[in-house]
């Protein structure tokens, strides 16, 4: 393959480049959008294929890339996509387009595409995981922790949204932009969402993570939310849940790093519908530095979505939940030919059916010894609101 990167002068909205049938990974307007498919490449071949692309770079520091999602269950085969057209926007304001082989791109035409207009549409929402089943699974995970088999396990449940006509992906992405602009918003082969959680970002030898664990709902009232945030910070249950995640990520990354630092205490990270405990980690990768995909596969799923110890938690999840998570709880993002990339935890998401008329939503919570099943149910309800409102809102 051959690639040609040239600068773009005019501003762009990556949501409009991706539309309803392209690829998107963006946060605060910075990220990438893709159109078409130059190749689908098995995960273990991605680094080699990207490095073999003959690339002319008129911008400087831009590399061919692949975008995709990695399923929750470790070792599940998957492919990343090398788009025929990639439009990118950096934090420093640089904008560019990369074309693979004979691909063409008309910026004016892309910018003039009409945005979807509000319209009436009928939806039904139904649980795929029965409430009693979910509560029983949470209790089983809690009892496993109390007995010493686990330190933590994450139990999730499914709901399905159905419409007589296809769900408008472009409209959903624009609603997510309005409500969750500072989350990592993504759209890849019918998998859409807005994740607040950075799994890993690598640029040169710099590495960053910002894991989240421990959650409380937002009410919309500033004073109530302030009290809830203080209670979240003071909650021993949520602090334990959070500490398990931080310790695992620290211990996993440290062998690759010459330097790794993290916040001594978690802070509260607020998004539109919930508040989380979050801890930022920053480090310097040792030479020879790993490809970001090596770090993604080493970290994912973190205890924020699986549990700890990992093998025992995944075994319990498989038995207790009663469904296959698929791409939920895995990782979503991009990697370039230099081995750099940004990946988020695949949460606050929906997976669309082939005809676009159904969306499967999944949400879960971390279970420790002090977890209460009804409180965990309420937490999943709060988390599901992110995608439910984006899909159903006219």
Predicted feature residues:
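Structural signature of FAD isoalloxazine-binding scaffolds in flavoprotein oxidoreductases
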Residues: 76-99, 340-352
């Amino acid at each position: 393959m051959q690639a040609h990167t040239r600068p773009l002068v005019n501003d762009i909205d990556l949501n409009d480049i991706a539309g309803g049938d392209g690829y998107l990974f963006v946060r605060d307007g910075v990220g990438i959008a893709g159109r078409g498919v130059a190749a689908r490449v098995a995960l273990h071949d991605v680094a080699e294929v990207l490095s073999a692309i003959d690339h002319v770079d008129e911008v400087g520091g831009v590399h061919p890339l692949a975008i995709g999602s990695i399923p929750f269950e470790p070792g599940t085969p998957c492919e990343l996509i090398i788009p025929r057209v990639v439009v990118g926007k950096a934090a420093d304001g640089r904008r560019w387009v990369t074309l693979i082989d004979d691909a063409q791109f008309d910026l004016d035409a892309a910018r003039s595409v009409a945005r979807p207009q509000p319209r009436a549409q009928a939806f039904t929402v139904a649980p795929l995981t029965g409430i009693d089943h979910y509560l029983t699974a949470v209790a089983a995970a809690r009892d496993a922790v109390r007995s010493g088999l686990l330190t933590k396990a994450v139990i999730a449940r499914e709901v399905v949204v159905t419409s007589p006509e296809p769900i408008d992906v472009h409209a959903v992405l624009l609603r997510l932009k309005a409500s969750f602009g500072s989350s990592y918003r993504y759209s890849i082969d019918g998998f859409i969402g807005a994740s607040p959680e950075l799994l890993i970002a690598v640029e040169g030898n710099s590495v960053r993570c910002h894991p989240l664990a421990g959650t409380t709902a937002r009410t919309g009232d500033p004073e109530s939310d302030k009290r809830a945030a203080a209670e979240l910070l003071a909650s021993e249950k949520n602090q334990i849940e959070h500490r398990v995640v931080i310790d695992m990520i620290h211990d996993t990354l440290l062998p690759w790093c010459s330097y790794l630092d993290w916040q001594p205490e978690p802070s509260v990270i607020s998004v539109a519908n919930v508040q989380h405990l979050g801890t930022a980690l920053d480090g310097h990768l040792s030479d020879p530095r790993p490809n970001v995909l090596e770090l993604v596969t080493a970290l994912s799923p973190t205890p924020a979505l699986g549990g700890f110890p990992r093998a025992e938690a995944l075994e319990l999840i498989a038995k207790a939940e009663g469904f296959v998570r698929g791409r939920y709880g895995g990782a979503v993002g991009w990697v370039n030919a230099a081995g750099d990339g940004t990946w988020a935890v695949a949460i606050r998401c929906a997976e669309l059916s082939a005809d676009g008329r159904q969306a499967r939503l999944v949400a879960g919570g971390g279970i420790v010894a002090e977890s209460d099943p009804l409180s965990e149910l309420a937490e999943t309800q709060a988390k599901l609101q992110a995608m439910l409102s984006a899909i159903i809102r006219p």
